Structures are given as structure tokens and as C-alpha cells.
């Protein structure tokens, strides 16, 4: 469905608003997919995006559902949307206009699929169901509240290479980015590799920290409104974006607690910084291992603090203390 319209040839441009429902989905990137919608530069699209498990997790689910969860395919994403006039060598800009969360969501820890997957504490699964219907935040446990900063975990274009491509790894043209700063007010710029660009989005999170260390944010369905434009003959090397506000947004209200880890391997430093944060949350806030890892995943920001003081680099994990009421 579309609203608005175009005037006759030579008249002023009148942008349109289009709607894609939950049935306009696919599971792989593919430059040969027929577009679900074709739009002009300047148009807006309202996407009804499903959650990623294809209905396997419901509001009534318990941790037992993870024992039979089918991850093939991992994502169902909305689109693709073709932009008229888009060609390889151009850049597509996408303005994030609005994201409206669903009434509930979930986070889970799945064995073998998290930052600390080799730790014995995480050899068993864990599922957290969130009530997202109480305004702009959700209770994790009594005394711990997570503010919403919703964004699409997946936003990207069809790769130029032929065939089907997994939605799991991020790419030059975007994809499974999980960049929590891609919130309302942000404008993205992505290089185009295939005619029409073929944009798709999904995997919406109500909140997530930088790192998504348990493997999920607060996963949910959502209504996502995006505005598209085209930069002809201009090509960015990879995704770039401009934010309208502060990096920390609603998190920065009461200071931060931080753990650090050093060493010559940034991956190991990242794991250790989160291990130390999990230990602190267990000790200071009486959380279980799984609860602590989920809280880190939805609220803790990982940062590379320095990469010049060889042979050791520093990774910092920062947790906003405003979560604790």
C-alpha cells in the first residue's frame, strides 16, 4: 500500500509512503530476488518486521523451547525494496524515522553461541521473556530496569556476488550489523553493489549493549519507518552513519561501572572484560551467571581503549549504573 503520489512529468516531486507487511520476508541475501516493493528516492517505507525465530519463541515460552530451536535460517528479514535509479557505484542513504516496539520480547543464552561459549557456566541454555508494554523501559528483575533504545540489528543491501548468502555475517553493504547506535534520527550510507540496491531489514532489538555478548539483545517484532535517498556517482567504502544525538542516549544517568582487560589479543581481552563484569554482577547484585551475561548483552558497552601500547591492548566493559533503581 502507498500514500501520496507523483505529479505529472515536469511537476514537483511528491514523496510517497509505502507499507510492507510481515509476509514480505526472505531468509538469504540474493541479488536475483524479485523486489517486494519498488520505490523512488525520497520515499518512505513502513516495515512490519517479525522476530527472528519464525514464531518458535512465544510470550509463554520457557527455557525448554531452546532445546528444539531451529536456527536454519537464522533471520527472517523484510524486503527487498528496490530503489529506482540505484546502480553499483552509487550510495543509498537510509534515515531511521521511527521504530515502534512490540508488547513483548526475549533474550536467550544458547550453548556455543555467545562470547563466553567455552565457559562451563554457559553449557546450558537460558531464556528471558521481557514485558515491553510498560512505556519506554522494561524490568529485568526487581531493582534493575532497561530503557529502550530500539534499532534494527539487520539493515543491508544485496551483495553483488551471485547466489544466496547467509544473513549472519555483516558485509560491506551492511547486513547483520547489530550496531546499537542505528536508532531513530540516525542516517546511514551504504555502498550499492547491485541494480536497485535491494534493501532489507529486520532482527529488531528494544535494547542492546555494544557487543551483544550473550548472542541476543532484547529481540522483538516492531514497526520500522525508514526514508530512502540516493547519492548518484558517490560511493562510500563501507557503511557509514551520522547520529543525531549522544552515543549513550538514555543510558547516561548515574555514572558507570567498568572492568578492563589487557593483553596482546583483543578477542581474549574482550572475553576477560566481560568475565570480570559477570563476576561483579554476581557478587554485587546477586545475579546468576546467565542473568549476568544477559544483562551485559542488553546494557554493557565494550570499548577498545587503546591499541598503541604494544605488546598489550586494553578492552573496557562499561555498565551504566542508572539501570539499578
Regions from the language model: what does each represent?
Residues 10, 15-69:
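N-terminal, Lys/Arg-enriched amphipathic/low-complexity engagement segments
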Residues 152-176, 180-266, 278:
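Conserved mixed alpha/beta catalytic, RNA-binding, or beta-rich assembly cores of soluble enzyme
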Residues 47, 91-94, 190:
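A generic structural signal for residues embedded in beta-strands
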Residues 52-63, 99-109, 196-206, 305-308:
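Short, Lys/Arg- and Gly-enriched loop/turn segments at beta-strand edges
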Residues 20-30, 70-78, 165-173:
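Short, structured beta-strand/loop micro-motifs enriched in basic residues and often containing a Trp
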Amino acid at each position: 500500500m502507498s500514500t501520496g503520489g507523483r505529479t505529472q512529468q515536469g511537476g514537483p516531486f511528491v514523496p510517497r509512503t509505502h507499507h510492507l507487511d510481515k509476509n514480505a520476508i526472505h531468509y538469504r541475501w540474493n541479488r536475483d530476488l524479485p523486489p517486494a516493493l519498488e520505490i523512488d528516492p525520497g520515499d518512505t517505507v513502513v516495515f512490519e518486521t517479525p522476530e527472528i525465530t519464525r514464531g518458535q519463541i512465544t510470550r509463554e515460552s520457557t527455557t525448554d523451547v531452546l532445546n528444539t530451536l531451529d536456527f536454519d535460517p537464522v533471520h527472517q528479514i523484510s524486503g527487498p525494496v528496490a530503489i529506482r535509479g540505484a546502480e553499483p557505484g552509487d550510495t543509498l542513504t537510509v534515515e531511521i524515522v521511527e521504530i515502534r516496539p512490540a508488547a513483548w520480547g526475549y533474550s536467550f543464552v544458547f550453548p556455543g553461541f555467545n562470547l563466553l561459549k567455552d565457559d562451563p557456566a554457559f553449557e546450558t541454555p537460558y531464556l528471558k521473556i521481557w514485558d515491553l508494554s510498560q512505556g519506554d523501559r522494561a524490568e529485568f528483575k526487581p531493582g534493575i530496569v532497561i530503557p529502550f533504545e530500539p534499532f534494527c540489528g539487520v539493515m543491508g543491501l544485496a551483495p553483488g556476488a551471485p547466489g544466496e548468502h547467509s544473513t549472519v555475517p555483516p558485509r560491506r553493504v551492511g547486513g547483520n550489523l547489530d550496531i546499537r547506535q542505528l536508532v531513530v534520527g540516525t542516517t546511514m550510507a551504504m555502498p550499492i553493489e547491485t541494480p536497485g540496491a535491494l534493501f532489507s531489514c529486520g532482527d529488531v532489538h528494544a535494547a542492546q549493549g555494544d557487543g551483544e555478548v550473550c548472542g541476543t539483545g532484547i529481540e522483538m517484532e516492531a514497526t520500522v519507518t525508514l526514508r530512502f535517498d540516493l547519492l548518484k556517482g558517490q560511493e562510500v567504502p563501507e557503511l557509514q552513519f551520522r547520529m543525531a544525538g549522544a552515543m549513550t542516549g538514555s543510558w547516561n544517568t548515574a555514572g558507570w561501572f567498568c572492568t578492563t582487560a589487557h593483553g596482546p589479543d583483543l578477542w581474549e581481552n574482550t572475553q576477560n572484560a566481560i568475565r570480570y563484569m559477570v563476576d561483579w554482577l554476581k557478587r554485587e547484585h546477586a545475579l546468576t551467571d546467565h542473568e549476568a551475561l544477559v544483562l551485559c548483552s542488553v546494557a554493557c558497552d565494550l570499548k577498545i581503549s587503546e591499541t598503541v601500547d604494544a605488546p598489550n591492548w586494553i578492552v573496557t566493559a562499561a555498565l551504566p549504573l542508572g539501570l539499578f533503581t
